[in-house]
UniProtKB/Swiss-Prot annotation:
Protein's gene: mqo1
Record EC number: 1.1.5.4
Organism superkingdom: Bacteria
Protein name, entry field: Probable malate:quinone oxidoreductase 1
NCBIfam families (alphabetical): mal_quin_oxido (TIGR01320), PRK05257.1-1 (NF003603), PRK05257.1-4 (NF003605), PRK05257.2-1 (NF003606), PRK05257.3-2 (NF003611), PRK05257.3-4 (NF003613), PRK13339.1 (NF009875)
Record-stated family: Belongs to the MQO family.
Keyword Oxidoreductase applies: yes
Cofactor: FAD
UniProt keyword annotations, A-Z: FAD, Flavoprotein, Oxidoreductase, Tricarboxylic acid cycle
Disulfide bonds: none
Gene Ontology terms, MF aspect: 2-hydroxyglutarate dehydrogenase activity; L-malate dehydrogenase (quinone) activity
Catalytic activity from the UniProt record: (S)-malate + a quinone = a quinol + oxaloacetate
């Protein structure tokens, strides 16, 4: 019998997660033999595709759900600070690769777009002002501005102001140095960098159909989507970074840590505008508050998008429900993911989240006119003929066991790894791509602890001069790292492009 091909690492899925981890591992140890396996015929074809996500460089600057308000009125800014520092870690990696000289222009994947929060009504205004006062005290948010002056808002977001009632009580905050990120372009840059490296392959139209233990590693069964042929690869480490498909693959591995996890797929839709006369009037990402009873991923926002050099506007998201785990997945994905170990948590979540289910169904049933009503809260003069509906990527929210409720629905990301560190999977969604680098560093520390503390420590320090905890507490270092990243990524205020968008 022919011997299986052997590699050090197999990464499943050619999206932002696998591409980041693969390039990072190659930087830490250029001798590693890596293989990326992707079922689609190109990279970044699912959630990393620029039109399958909002492209917000999530840094806690404008996302109001990152600063939740408790029943007593207090506001917690910890999550916003943490995500801000995580994004700064991502920017350190991109800046490092750009400065190396073989990564091309950063402007191909990241562009300066101001981040704004916008609220209506006395309650909303009170919340935003309190949030601003708290965030402003932290060095990461020192440049944030607040206004209730409609003339100032007209300057910040001119498309959104005409047609409003004169007595409407509104407020906004603005951070000029926000970003729009084309995660598809970034992913493909990383994959090209990987493909140009020795002992690294990216294989498309190849689907993982089996995972079985092989001593201290894994045997990965891979099927050719086109020919139907199959091969087996032995790997010391396997990463499941396949977006919505990560859960079924994790279940396939059979590791004890996978027991009890389920998935709740949520689809998304956007309204998109390419009319240059309208697009030029809005150069910002403006986030507001989710409707009462709506889930956190439904926070509405009106965004500038820069994709392949072309600027468009995007509004949404409008949520929906399907049983597919991927946009190009199967309607059987959800039913086939049910196991004896997760049926309890899944039923508990179904019982406790009837409001969410009703919300998703109502979103699916919306007419174009109803969708435009939501848009007109932001842009009162919006006309149907300027906007078209786009289907976004799938997000599989995590269902996990809970000792009290039986099961809970978790919004966010979760890294699940085998006890021996030989396999890891990334489950969940937001803030996702923006904090990829932080999550992959956590994976490296968890699955390669000896190397992270030993042979790889110096290189990690070179790539990442400051990590999240230090960035959160050392103001001078934060500002230095941030300025260095701005310069390397062509986001400094002195750059012509930065001036154009700010």
């Amino acid at each position: 019998m022919a011997q299986n091909e052997s590699v050090d690492v197999v990464l499943v899925g050619a999206g932002i997660m696998s591409a980041t981890l693969a390039v990072l591992l190659k930087e830490l140890d250029p001798t590693l033999k890596l293989e990326v396996v992707e079922a689609m015929d190109s990279g970044a074809a699912e959630s990393s595709n620029p039109w399958n996500n909002a492209g917000t460089g999530h840094a806690g600057l404008c996302e109001l759900n990152y600063t939740p308000q408790a029943a007593d009125g207090s506001i917690d800014i910890k999550k916003a600070v943490h995500i801000n520092t995580q994004f700064e870690v991502s920017r350190q990696f991109w800046a490092y690769l750009t400065k190396k000289g073989n990564f091309g222009s950063a402007r191909a994947f990241i562009n300066p777009v101001p981040h704004l929060s916008y609220v209506e009504g006395d309650k909303g205004v009170s919340f935003l002002k309190k949030r601003f006062e708290l965030l402003k005290q932290h060095h990461a948010f020192a440049e944030m501005e607040y206004t209730e002056d409609k003339a100032v808002m007209n300057d910040w977001m001119p498309l959104m102001m005409p047609g409003r009632p004169a007595d409407q009580h509104i407020a906004a905050t603005r951070v000029a140095k926000g970003t729009d990120v084309n995660f598809g372009a970034l992913t493909n840059k990383l994959l090209k960098l990987l493909g140009d490296s020795p002992d690294a392959q990216v294989k498309y139209s190849k689907k993982v159909v089996g995972l079985r233990r092989n001593g201290s590693g894994w045997t990965v069964s891979i099927k050719d989507v086109n020919s139907g042929g199959s091969r087996e690869v032995d790997a010391r480490f396997v990463f499941l970074g396949a977006g919505g498909a990560a859960l079924p693959l994790l279940q396939l591995s059979g590791i004890p840590e996978s027991k009890g996890f389920g998935g709740f797929p949520v689809s998304g839709q956007w309204l998109r505008c390419d009319n240059p006369e309208i697009v030029k009037q809005h150069q910002a990402k403006v986030y507001s508050q989710a409707a009462v009873g709506a889930p956190p991923m439904s926070v509405p926002h009106l965004d500038t998008r820069v994709v392949d050099g072309k600027t468009s506007l995007l509004f949404g998201p409008y949520a929906g429900f399907t049983t597919k785990f991927l946009k190009h997945g199967s309607l059987m994905d959800l039913p086939l993911s049910v196991r004896m170990g997760n049926i309890g948590p899944m039923l508990a979540v179904a019982r406790d989240n009837m409001d969410l289910t009703k919300y998703l169904v109502s979103e699916v049933m919306q007419s174009m006119e109803q969708r435009l009503e939501a848009l007109r809260r932001f842009y009162p003069q919006a006309k149907a003929e300027d906007w078209r509906l786009e289907v976004a990527g799938q997000r599989v929210q995590i269902i996990k066991k809970d000792p009290k409720k039986g099961g809970v629905l978790q919004f966010g990301t979760e890294l699940v790894s085998a006890q021996d560190g030989s396999l890891a999977a990334l489950l969940g969604a937001s803030p996702g791509a923006s904090v990829t680098v932080s999550i992959m560093l956590e994976l490296i520390e968890r699955c390669f602890p000896e190397q992270a503390k030993g042979a790889w420590a110096a290189k990690l320090k070179e790539i990442f001069p400051a990590r999240e905890k230090t960035l959160a507490t050392d103001a001078a270092l934060y500002h230095k790292i941030s300025a260095d990243n701005d310069a390397a990524l062509d986001l400094a205020e002195s750059s012509p492009a930065a001036k154009h968008y700010a």
